[in-house]
Amino acid sequence: MKDLLNLFKQPGAQLEDFDAIRIGLASPEMIRSWSYGEVKKPETINYRTFKPERDGLFCAKIFGPVKDYECLCGKYKRLKHRGVVCEKCGVEVTIAKVRRERMGHIDLASPVAHIWFLKSLPSRIGLLLDMTLRDIERILYFEAFVVIEPGMTPLERGQLLSDEAYLDAIEQHGDEFEAKMGAEAVLDLLKSLDMTGEARTLREEIEGTNSESKIKRLSKRLKLIEAFLESGNKPEWMIMDVLPVLPPDLRPLVPLDGGRFATSDLNDLYRRVINRNNRLKRLLELSAPDIIVRNEKRMLQESVDALLDNGRRGRAITGTNKRPLKSLADMIKGKQGRFRQNLLGKRVDYSGRSVIVVGPTLRLHQCGLPKRMALELFKPFIFSKLQLRGLATTIKAAKKMVERETGEVWDILSEVIREHPVMLNRAPTLHRLGIQAFEPVLIEGKAIQLHPLVCTAFNADFDGDQMAVHVPLSLEAQLEARALMMSTNNILSPASGEPIIVPSQDVVLGLYYMTRERLDAKGRGMVFTDVQEVHRAHQNGVLDLGARVQVRIREAVFDENGGMNERVHRVETVAGRALLYEIVPDGLPFELVDRDMTKKAISGLVNACYRRVGLKGTVVFADQLMYMGFSMSTGAGVSIGVNDMEVPAEKEKILADAEEEVKDIEEQYASGLVTNGERYNKVVDIWSHTNEAVAKAMMEKMGKDLVEVDGEQKEQKSFNSIFMMADSGARGSAAQIRQLAGMRGLMAKPDGSIIETPITANFREGLNVLQYFISTHGARKGLADTALKTANSGYLTRRLVDVSQDLVVTEEDCGTTEGLHMTPIIEGGDVVETLADRVLGRVVAEDVYKPGTDEVVAAAGTLLDEEWVEHLEQQGVDEIRVRSPITCQTRHGVCAQCYGRDLARGHGVNVGEAVGVIAAQSIGEPGTQLTMRTFHIGGAASRAASINNVQVRNSGSVRLHNVKVVKHHSGNYVAVSRSGEVTVMDDHGRERERYKIPYGAVLSVADGDAVESGQIVANWDPHTHPIITEVEGRVRFYDFVEGVTVAREVDEVTGLSSLVVTDPKSRGNGEHRRMVTDASGKQVEERVAYKDLRPMIKLVDEDGNDLNIAGTDIPAHYFLPAEAIISLEDGAEVRVGDALARIPQESSKTRDITGGLPRVADLFEARKPKEPAILAEVSGTVGFGKDTKGKQRLVITKADGETYEELIPKWRTVTVFEGEHVEKGEVIADGEPNPHDILRLLGVTALAAYVVKEIQDVYRLQGVKINDKHIEVICRQMLRKVGVKDPGESHFLRGEQVDRARVLEANDALEAADKTPATFEPLLLGITKASLATESFISAASFQETTRVLTEAATRGARDDLRGLKENVIVGRLIPAGTGFAYHEERRRAQADPIAAAESAIGLGGGEQPATSETGAGGSDPSEEG
């Protein structure tokens, strides 16, 4: 282990290769060994001569000469005296740069505690001595004595004594005991610790105790003591006798004009320490009174504290201008600290920035670079060329020529620039496509020209955005820029694998316009021999683009074997489409362009082109598309006029109808038929429906034109400009058009509740004052949110990158057979994501069989590409097990098989790809689009009308899942289960639709029935929740006390009365007396407090005996929650499936459970929800035990008769019934599931599925596509740590959090030695926690809480193996990813076997090299096939 600071002792000794960095505590000897002399005086420099003072903070004798090779007094100058020490001034003659690396030291007159180990919680000193922080501070700051050696006295070691107590003890015991105060006392205590003995006793204590909290406390201390023992640090080093002094050039003193000086704050802080130290020395020599010395020692301690970490204890020391001084700790932490400012965020030479303008004539790989800018950026290349040509003799002459900008200079510039890519970057760089390489084209002017198609990737527009240009200098850098970063090599988005180079806005509009059919177009019905003729006809004005014509086209398509087949045939199509097909490359069929080219269709076209024709063809095609789109949209002349916003004529009638309905509801409310909450819900519902209806009418009117064709009226798709913009996907959406020409609809208040009076006007008609005022709420909130959102999104990305930065593909295959189970995602009647989309680009984990047979369709280990997926779809496969990063067994990193396809390249992922960072960027980049709370479009409330039935969309057969039904006397079935679902299967037995069936829904079909499309299979009342009886009998009320547990409400209009259950909280304090039969059959009076009464309905037979639920011996008792409304009378007869009571549902905040970004952050931080769902801890049968005061007791009886109890608060909705069977991990009380519970009860894959689903839901709502595997990669990083359950014979402690890789390595070693390995369970850490808990302390320290991380790492003597990317960037090495991965592998191999490495370098290892190249080919084979 080399000592970093002593490396600089030998002149010119640079740090050679190193593979790890260790951090530890510095012993006083080590600090003295770094030092070149003691700093004795607080002076800095002499203000008259500007020479450093001798023995001061800038002393040249200690730190080295101020000028190169010149001593301070000027006796020795120049290089020939190098290494001489001047006898007059004592300065060594050497370069001045040593003042950046030579350290000094200060010998402290009294020891001082290091504040980090004292105050950084948990206090390390306190933990070692087993004392509280408060006590130790009292000792250190001279408020109390501590007993160090009790001798024969009754005092105890480590006991604190106040002044009086100390004097008393002295009186009593004289000098039999020893007590001290200050850091010396703590130093003595630490020195006298017997670490090994302590560790032994602690281990025994832990074995012998059962209390959790005690174990936690003891193991904390044990861990620290063992860390000290292992690392070779000594506890007494946490108290310092000698203080290192930073080299002077790192804390400079700079003269300003006017004779003043700017100084680094550190100089002030050091000066304070030196002053106090010198004063203390003098006082000790004079043997001053104790109290004065004590005070001075305390001040010394405080000044050292301030130097190390100002403001950590007490008030921060401030400078002249009331601003706290920047201490050593502040230098490294925070955004402005060393890590984030200088090590991770360096500024780059050879770069410039300018405004961007559009470059529609560029090709995809080009950018326009202003001449002046290029001249400046490529200067070194121009100089060398000028010298090479002999046009300039020296660099100076070359410089002159360039400044004069002579003709030859421009010629040489254009030569230098040829084929030399430059990199363009637009801040904020949210994902890797924010920096791309282009070939520069010299242009006049001062703005950079950017190709329009890369705007999406950069998220750039031309409203004044600026971009930076960087020049890759070395040949390797140019090569990488060209091969990896060129815009033409980044066609697909790394987030979703879809093309990102797709036309948008005017290009889309142009292509859409040219491919739209016009029924009344000029030249319809003409016939052409080829596309050239169509061109001529169009240019001569005989033919409109939208005319349907017949034309002969040449179509070239690939056959099965990959050969190209040409066929020429006649098609009937729109003229514009024939013209468009001309630029489509060979290999794509005509049907791809024979449709209206909306943005989606164009994206599909580019995608198909990339998959079938390859990269080069796609690049050329994309450019052609753009040129054509621009020219066509110019020709189309689409513009917006007020008349384009057509308000539908039916609007008035629709509104009038809605007003009527609302009036009805208001009347019902007035007559007491509905509660206020129900009224509000229904009104909001009506207006939501109305808004939909108006929008529908408007779109119908806008989307259709009537034209006269050959004397008759025909209907066609509209050519309304606004409609075309929205329909083509160029700009705008149906929701925006709705506000322009429909009605604005319901608005939301800032708190998210919906204002029940909607804005019936639209922007075309104009808003009145009230309407405008209502709509300002949402609009303002929207703007405020946007500002907060951007910052939050950036922070989320930072946390994600930090947790996943060290995840790299490190091997080809880890050999696991595990994986995730994939099925299509179906919500309601829609297949939201097909199986094909989910498994595309994944590797199959186990053989896939054709449903119902044992024929293997895809073998394990197949990488599924587009063709494979299509094949699987045709075979009717509806579930596949695929490999996933979550289940990957690779220790460090992931393997290529588990990751699957590299989404941005379309083939298997290469070893060395930094998949972690890609995942983090893919999730973080769309973060800015995610709203904080989802109010779209100027605050218009987006709340779907509540659903009250299930209407099937496809015909097929119905399957019911966990639906328990009872047959109603009307012949229908009523659902009496809570988590039931109904699915519709097609003829192949594949699931097409899936719906939730709520409790109390009336089903009109049974399991296995055939249904037609459009049929309603279930319906229910969305605003109330019924309680259904499962048996027939008489109603008997129990615990119904009018005025106490129930209140009778009489409707004034109808005169009908109903009972409403009151809330137990509002019942008052009385007691209720009731008669009960005791064990001997006697009637006894029982007193029950009002609060404990539980109103319920019992069902009894004719004789009044309790009835049981069919098939069980559980009595039919139905408990009634607060607010339940009962409209039956006591003794009424009920039939199976009747409703006994109904509970009104009041819900109408904007349907938006923490939407958007905060939801994503909550999931990744693995936060516990406020009211988590309660999950069943074991499988078994549910029963209810005796209730406690505020909780109900739920008992689960396992199959073997063991019982498990769970106390559930009474206000929680329990979703299971007595006698129901639950599986481990099933929900028993509603709520948001807690991810930690899912992991504990259901395992890693269930957790992954949950997180992926929840996060995808948020992104899907915003229409953002992200591949599942990115979320899985982050999940893998959150599951890095495991909790040790039983340490076995390992050195881990019970409950310790350890990296999974470390436990597995330790277990391998234990198993090899035939010892019992440790058992562990996976732990889920949030991304911030996981980043701070990483094995690499450098990475953690540069993320957050720098002080805490470094303190902890130093006491452990932590070693950083520089595995991740971040650590390597910080120490300035190549990162172990991409091209750096191979470099590091090579180095590792060379170290492991230096002789073989040397041989292979010379070329002696003849047998070896062909082998490696062969395996290389073998490794890349599958990707070529795919």
From Swiss-Prot:
Mg(2+) binds at D461, D463, D465. Binds 1 Mg(2+) ion per subunit. Pfam families: RNA_pol_Rpb1_1, RNA_pol_Rpb1_2, RNA_pol_Rpb1_3, RNA_pol_Rpb1_4, RNA_pol_Rpb1_5. Keywords: DNA-directed RNA polymerase, Magnesium, Metal-binding, Nucleotidyltransferase, Transcription, Transferase, Zinc. One of its GO terms (cellular component) is DNA-directed RNA polymerase complex. SUPFAM superfamilies: beta and beta-prime subunits of DNA dependent RNA-polymerase. Its cofactor is Mg(2+); Zn(2+). Its EC number is 2.7.7.6. Zn(2+) 1 binds at C71, C73, C86, C89. Zn(2+) 2 binds at C814, C888, C895, C898. InterPro entries: DNA-dir_RpoC_beta_prime (IPR045867), DNA-dir_RpoC_beta_prime_bact (IPR012754), RNA_pol_asu (IPR000722), RNA_pol_N (IPR006592), RNA_pol_Rpb1_1 (IPR007080), RNA_pol_Rpb1_3 (IPR007066), RNA_pol_Rpb1_3_sf (IPR042102), RNA_pol_Rpb1_4 (IPR007083). One of its GO terms (molecular function) is magnesium ion binding. One of its GO terms (biological process) is DNA-templated transcription. Belongs to the RNA polymerase beta' chain family. HAMAP family: RNApol_bact_RpoC. DNA-dependent RNA polymerase catalyzes the transcription of DNA into RNA using the four ribonucleoside triphosphates as substrates. This is DNA-directed RNA polymerase subunit beta'. It comes from Alkalilimnicola ehrlichii (strain ATCC BAA-1101 / DSM 17681 / MLHE-1). The lineage of its organism: Bacteria, Pseudomonadati, Pseudomonadota, Gammaproteobacteria, Chromatiales.
